UniProtKB/Swiss-Prot annotation:
Its EC number is 6.3.4.20. Binds 1 zinc ion per subunit. This is 7-cyano-7-deazaguanine synthase. The lineage of its organism: Bacteria, Pseudomonadati, Pseudomonadota, Alphaproteobacteria, Hyphomicrobiales. The gene is queC. Keywords: ATP-binding, Ligase, Metal-binding, Nucleotide-binding, Queuosine biosynthesis, Zinc. It comes from Agrobacterium fabrum (strain C58 / ATCC 33970) (Agrobacterium tumefaciens (strain C58)).
Length: 236
């Protein structure tokens, strides 16, 4: 299966890129600059492409992102600290982000005669992000079948959509994913902050998977208190 992977440079998408490279035919990685404050993640995506020996397509959609106002990832709004399940994390939603990225990626895949576009959405994303849920993935795949009917046959591959981030870590170990060469923190500082939703989820995932976390955090222990009040929640 000739596959293009949407890769942000984060733990999930880099792990997916390594998985695809091992199990299928990885054609390229595609990343998006949408004006995110944690733009340094894109350097990790570029490094992943170089490591796997495939092209890296960096697509600038900053002019679109500038109009998707109200998100802590793109606006002058503080990135909240805490667990992903907290209501404050809704401020990190960039409306329709995955739908926009996937639409572009499908066009690229059709032009390059790929069989699939792969995305690393997972079960831990469901509570906050509607465009990471199984219902969205299935509906988008059906929509694209109509959009490209008679021109190209490209499918959406989302192998992590119903599993936890800890399961991704466990799976990624099999493919030698270099966890230290991934970036998750939404704040985009010199080091992972250890306090934002993605840092908390990242640290918790390594703990639950029983895998050593090589990440340096500004606050390495915040995740313990942040996760105590929450159990994994699924939204379909």
């Amino acid at each position: 299966m000739k596959t293009i992977v949407i890769c942000s440079g984060g733990l999930d998408s880099v792990s997916l890129a390594h998985k695809i490279a091992a199990e299928h035919e990885l054609l390229a990685l595609v990343s998006f600059d949408y004006g995110q404050r944690h733009k340094k993640e894109l350097d990790f995506a570029a490094d992943c492409a170089k490591r796997l020996g495939v092209p890296h397509h960096l697509i600038d959609i900053g002019t679109i992102g500038a109009h998707l106002t109200g998100s802590a990832l793109t606006d002058d709004i503080d990135v909240p600290d805490g667990h992903y399940a907290e209501e404050t994390m809704r401020s990190t939603v960039v409306p329709n982000r995955n739908a926009i990225m996937l639409t572009i990626a499908f066009g690229l895949a059709a032009a390059q005669q790929a069989d699939a576009v792969a995305i690393a959405v997972h079960g831990g994303d469901h509570f906050i992000y509607p465009d990471c849920r199984p219902g969205f993935i299935g509906s988008f795949n059906a929509m694209q079948a109509h959009a490209l009917e008679g021109y190209a046959d490209v499918t959406l591959f989302a192998p992590y959509v119903t599993v936890s981030k800890a399961a991704i870590v466990t799976d990624a170990v099999k493919y030698g994913t270099p966890f230290g060469e991934t970036w998750s923190c939404y704040k985009g500082g010199l080091r992972h902050c250890g306090r934002c939703g993605t840092c908390v989820e990242r640290r918790e995932a390594f703990h639950l998977a029983g895998v050593t976390d090589p990440t340096e955090y500004e606050d390495p222990d915040f995740w313990v208190a942040a996760t105590q009040a929450y159990a994994a929640q699924e939204v379909h």
